[in-house]
């Protein structure tokens, strides 16, 4: 329970009201809430003040563009409506006060960049859990303690949601949290008042340009996490051109590189000196300002070497013991359904990935190839009632980057599965070499049966999804379960 005066000092007319929570969406208002009426990107929350009052809001905080109006109060139906100048940019701090500044009560790491945010926050939570923490994540796949994640709508929730989620983590005993910070979230001041222990920058590519107009604006948006917001340590990918520029401006930041010929100019740095890929994952030899050694990673792909090293540098800069980190690294699994490796003795290695666009399929096949001593198999399909144009393009990519291809169904929805497959087959130069098997479980089993033990089978398109949509029916189906079941039955065959 928060008193209004604790938030805003002695606001004239505002009685000492007790408030239960801060709410931005008038539809979610309950008895005892503080309704926050913001002038948003698309919607003006101030239009909904009457609805909020009708639903029992105890007080309203309304944005104003007029500095003279700041903290002036009017009463409507017994409810104080308090004007607040430039409320949007102060909301993180107000929500921080309201929820008792939870970011000060745990170790908080913010991750920004185009790719890798989700994997990095998962790896941070997994690794710190192995080291005895109670760790939480906030981002694309949801918010919550590791293993109890609830789905979320945006990568970075509103300023209020972020503070409320952190307060919830603290209440549940978390002492470590990794949060994905989107560029939208930075521009809209959603993480403004958080005390970050570490900020990580992954990389920058053409993403969300409709919102930010140009690459330069986008880079500036991301950079706010390192310059204007308070973070004790900055970890920056030195293999990215934007990262290199930032490192020149931030002498105290930690430079992280996968390039063996990298010459560090920072006092603190980490680089890979040799990387060996195999079906088991990657062996990474490293040197750093903390010492040198070897990491045995079960993760797949070059990009996951970069992700892992950024996480490793983060934990080293927070003071974790280098030997303990090296000992626990093989237990890290990354994100469910993203280049997820499944294996059994004397069996081919299976990789399940959610790649369902041409670009993602190409990257997944190239990553799988790094780990493949024998032949590379690809099992994929294309969704029905969705972009038809990509079907032949994905065929071309599968043919170019894999040795054997099996085309199967992937959520045909209300389209004819046979028609979808025809659209895909049109993209192959040699369709006679391609197998078609509509039943997805059978397609996966066929690939695993035909592949040798040093082959790799990439099963693309579903990732963490555990359903198949046929017609309008959602049926339970999981690529992982199909593979695990097959391995369980066949593991004893030499």
Curated annotation (Swiss-Prot):
Subcellular location: Cytoplasm
Residues that, per the record, bind ATP: 113-119
Key words, A-Z: ATP-binding, Cell cycle, Cell division, Cell shape, Cell wall biogenesis/degradation, Cytoplasm, Ligase, Magnesium, Nucleotide-binding, Peptidoglycan synthesis
Enzyme kind, highest EC tier: ligase
One Pfam family of this chain: Mur_ligase_M
Cofactor needs: Mg(2+)
GO biological process terms on file: cell division; cell wall organization; peptidoglycan biosynthetic process; regulation of cell shape
Main location class: cytoplasm
Post-translational modification: Carboxylation is probably crucial for Mg(2+) binding and, consequently, for the gamma-phosphate positioning of ATP.
Protein EC: 6.3.2.13
N6-carboxylysine, modified sites: 222
Pathway noted in the entry: Cell wall biogenesis; peptidoglycan biosynthesis
GO molecular function, one term: ATP binding
Family listed: Belongs to the MurCDEF family. MurE subfamily.
Protein name: UDP-N-acetylmuramoyl-L-alanyl-D-glutamate--2,6-diaminopimelate ligase
Protein's organism: Pasteurella multocida (strain Pm70)
UniProt gene name: murE
């Amino acid at each position: 329970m928060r008193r209004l005066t604790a938030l805003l000092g002695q606001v004239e007319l505002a009685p000492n009201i007790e408030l239960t929570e801060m709410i931005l969406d008038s539809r979610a208002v309950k008895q005892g809430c503080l309704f926050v009426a913001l002038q948003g990107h698309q919607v003006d929350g101030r239009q909904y003040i009457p609805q909020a009052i009708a639903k029992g809001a105890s007080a309203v905080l309304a944005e104003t563009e007029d500095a003279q109006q700041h903290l002036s109060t009017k009463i409507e139906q017994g409810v104080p409506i308090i004007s607040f100048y430039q409320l949007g940019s102060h909301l993180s701090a107000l929500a921080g006060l309201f929820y008792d500044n939870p970011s000060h009560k745990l170790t908080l790491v913010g991750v920004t960049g185009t790719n890798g945010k989700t994997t990095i926050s998962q790896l941070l939570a997994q690794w710190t859990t192995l080291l005895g923490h109670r760790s939480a994540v906030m981002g694309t796949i949801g918010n919550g303690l590791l293993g109890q994640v609830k789905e979320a709508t945006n990568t970075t929730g509103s300023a209020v949601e972020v503070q409320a989620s952190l307060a919830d983590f603290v209440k549940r005993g978390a002492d470590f949290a990794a949060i994905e910070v989107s560029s939208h979230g930075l521009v809209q001041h959603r993480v403004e008042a958080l005390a970050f222990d570490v900020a990580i920058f992954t990389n920058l590519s053409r993403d969300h340009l409709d919102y930010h107009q140009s690459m330069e604006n986008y880079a500036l948006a991301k950079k706010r996490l390192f310059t204007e917001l308070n973070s004790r340590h900055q970890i920056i990918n030195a293999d990215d051109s934007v990262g290199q520029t930032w490192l020149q401006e931030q002498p105290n930041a930690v430079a992280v590189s996968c390039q063996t010929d990298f010459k560090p100019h920072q006092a603190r740095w980490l680089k890979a000196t040799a990387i060996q890929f195999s079906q088991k994952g990657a062996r990474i030899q490293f040197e750093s300002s903390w010492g040198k050694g070897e990491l045995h990673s079960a993760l797949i792909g070059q990009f996951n070497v970069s992700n892992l090293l950024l996480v490793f540098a983060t934990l080293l800069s927070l003071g974790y013991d280098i030997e303990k980190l090296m000992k626990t690294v093989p237990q890290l699994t990354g994100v469910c359904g993203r280049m997820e490796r499944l294996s059994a003795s004397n069996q081919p290695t299976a990789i399940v990935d959610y790649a369902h666009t041409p670009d993602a399929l190409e990257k997944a096949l190239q990553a799988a190839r790094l780990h493949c001593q024998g032949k590379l198999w690809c099992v994929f399909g294309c969704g029905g009632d969705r972009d038809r144009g990509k079907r032949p393009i994905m065929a071309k990519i599968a043919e170019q980057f894999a040795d054997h291809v099996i085309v199967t169904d992937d959520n045909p929805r209300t389209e004819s599965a046979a028609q979808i497959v025809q659209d895909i087959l049109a993209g192959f130069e040699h369709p006679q070499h391609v197998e078609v098997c509509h039943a997805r479980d059978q397609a996966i089993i066929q690939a695993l049966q035909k592949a040798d033990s040093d082959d790799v089978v990439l099963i693309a398109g579903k990732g963490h999804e555990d359903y198949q949509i046929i017609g309008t029916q959602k049926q339970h189906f999981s690529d992982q379960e199909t593979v695990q079941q097959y391995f369980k039955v066949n593991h004893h065959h030499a």
